[in-house]
């Protein structure tokens, strides 16, 4: 049986790595925003951060909550509907559930710091274009699914997050915003797992359909260029009020 052939019995798993390396590892890494103390971050925000640093952090956090909702929908709606294997569906639902934890956590950070204009993210050109690129790819046949999954796993769960993570983590290196820094560590762990397993699933598709890789190559490379351009615009938006103490937009 192949990845797209339905299996009614729960077991035996045909693709057990999606249980052991996907579902189980994510389940073992469970966390909630309530575990993160934020009193120090509030004090840093009110007393130590400059206006440009606050603008930088705000530009990042407002976008994160909305983006995580779209990523959750991708796992729980698209991936689950494409692959009728319990082990893959369970992994996808677990990943989607974890993305809701990220969304709640970022919303909690926003509200704690007084950043609650969530709709502003959707109307700001640089961030809106980046957001649209994450959810624009559809798939209704193996080739379309392969293109969508490769682009999503490599860029939505990979490239699109890490410049912002690096910026936020830079504050922890200055002994600032430690609560946000802790959340970044946990989020990076989760997103790295999601990207890894999504890419693994795409490669599995290519093993079962050797023509798929060649057929997807052009669109994936085009998406890479699009995401790079969108990410550069997003970085310019983050640093619109200038560089910060230990980090420059160029970096």
In which residue ranges do the predicted regions lie?
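Non-heme di-metal
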Residues: 1-251
């Amino acid at each position: 049986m192949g990845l797209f052939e339905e299996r009614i019995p729960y077991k035996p798993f045909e693709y057990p790595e999606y249980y052991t390396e996907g579902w189980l590892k994510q389940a073992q890494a469970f966390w909630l925003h309530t575990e993160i103390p934020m009193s120090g971050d509030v004090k840093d925000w009110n007393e130590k951060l400059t206006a440009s640093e606050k603008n930088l952090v705000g530009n990042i956090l407002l976008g994160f909550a909305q983006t995580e909702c779209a990523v959750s929908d991708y796992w729980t709606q698209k991936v689950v509907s494409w692959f009728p294997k319990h082990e893959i569906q369970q992994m996808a639902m677990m990943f989607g559930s974890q993305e809701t934890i990220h969304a709640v956590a970022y919303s909690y950070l926003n509200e704690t710091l007084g950043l609650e204009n969530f709709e502003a993210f959707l109307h700001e050109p640089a961030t809106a274009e980046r957001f649209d690129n994450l959810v624009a790819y559809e798939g209704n046949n193996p080739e379309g699914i392969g293109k969508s999954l490769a682009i999503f796993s490599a860029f939505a769960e990979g490239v699109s997050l890490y410049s912002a993570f690096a910026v936020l983590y830079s504050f922890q290196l200055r002994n600032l915003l430690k609560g946000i820094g802790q959340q970044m560590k946990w989020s990076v762990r989760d997103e790295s797992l999601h990207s890894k397993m999504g890419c693994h699933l795409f490669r599995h598709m290519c093993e079962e359909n050797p023509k798929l890789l060649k057929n997807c190559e052009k669109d994936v490379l085009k998406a890479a260029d699009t995401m790079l351009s969108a990410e550069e615009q997003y970085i310019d938006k983050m640093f619109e009020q200038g560089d910060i103490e230990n980090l420059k937009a160029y970096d």
